[in-house]
Amino acid sequence: MPELPEVETVRRGLEPVLSGARLSSVRANRPDLRFPLPDGFVQRLTGARILRLDRRAKYILAPLDRGDTLVMHLGMTGRFEIAAPEGTVRPGDFAREVTPDDKHAHVVFQTEDGATVTYFDPRRFGFMDLIPTDRVSHHAWFAAMGPEPLGEGFDARTLEKAFANRKQGPKTLLLDQRTVAGLGNIYVCEALHRSGISPFKPSGNIAKKRLTPLTAAIKDVLAEAVEVGGSTLKDFAAADGALGYFQHRFRVYDREGEPCPTPACKGVIAREVQAGRSTFFCPVCQV
């Protein structure tokens, strides 16, 4: 599933085409994705102007001039194709370029400027909704979300409060969207390794002085991933078709059996299943 850097990469790819654009037509080729499309979806969007493109956690938000916000989530395999007057760019399929199958083209947006943005989703785990803009922060998807990890509201004090007296490992708590918004398995594994913290250590036993380096590692690994367009693994591609390259910088994720890259560490990267997900870590230098 695309994580925060991948979603931010898609948002940035869509922004030049959709931010400020008026939708001349909208077509929904089916009544549902993961969830049914909202009542009047096409009518409420047609003729509306998209004021800007935002991101909250793994959601792309498009506030409209009519008082609603279009909320989009990519799910597992959602992607966009942009066809502009200067040409069409098709998205890749993580590790290779593919031509999207038209049978998976579920929603098509056309702008007054002549651009067509098509949402493809073979597995239909993504979804779209229209929420009154002044109610977005109160919606069930967002009301309990923690701070954005790249924002000023996320710091060591956030983790100190979330970890206090908790027996769960830090990975489990960092994946909880109530702790911090948008973190996923890949980047939590990478940040914990950079900060030398075991994903299994009871969070309440982690010394407070270690939380500042952990916070910095989370911010650094996300910023680096956004800079290079996210990680190309299986289904993610940027809106302009570019593939992400952060996977080439992985230190532990999907590196089972390889030497730990930490200088002077003699450990070997291991993998264990934790809460149904693969956890990659160094059993020597992560304590």
Swiss-Prot record:
SUPFAM superfamilies, per database record: Glucocorticoid receptor-like (DNA-binding domain), N-terminal domain of MutM-like DNA repair proteins, S13-like H2TH domain
Active site positions, chain numbering: P2 (schiff-base intermediate with dna), E3 (proton donor), K58 (proton donor), R277 (proton donor)
Single GO BP term: base-excision repair
UniProt xrefs under InterPro entries: DNA_glyclase/AP_lyase_DNA-bd (IPR015886), DNA_glyclase_Znf_dom_DNA_BS (IPR015887), Formamido-pyr_DNA_Glyclase (IPR020629), FPG_cat (IPR012319), MutM-like_N-ter (IPR035937), Ribosomal_uS13-like_H2TH (IPR010979), Znf_DNA_glyclase/AP_lyase (IPR000214), Znf_FPG/IleRS (IPR010663)
Cofactor entry: Zn(2+)
Keyword Transferase: no
MF term (GO), any: damaged DNA binding
Entry's cofactor comment: Binds 1 zinc ion per subunit.
Catalytic activities: Hydrolysis of DNA containing ring-opened 7-methylguanine residues, releasing 2,6-diamino-4-hydroxy-5-(N-methyl)formamidopyrimidine; 2'-deoxyribonucleotide-(2'-deoxyribose 5'-phosphate)-2'-deoxyribonucleotide-DNA = a 3'-end 2'-deoxyribonucleotide-(2,3-dehydro-2,3-deoxyribose 5'-phosphate)-DNA + a 5'-end 5'-phospho-2'-deoxyribonucleoside-DNA + H(+)
Superkingdom field: Bacteria
Zn finger region (FPG-type): 251-287
EC number, UniProt record: 3.2.2.23, 4.2.99.18
PANTHER family: FORMAMIDOPYRIMIDINE-DNA GLYCOSYLASE
NCBIfam families according to UniProt: fpg, PRK01103.1
Name of protein: Formamidopyrimidine-DNA glycosylase
Lineage: Bacteria, Pseudomonadati, Pseudomonadota, Alphaproteobacteria, Caulobacterales
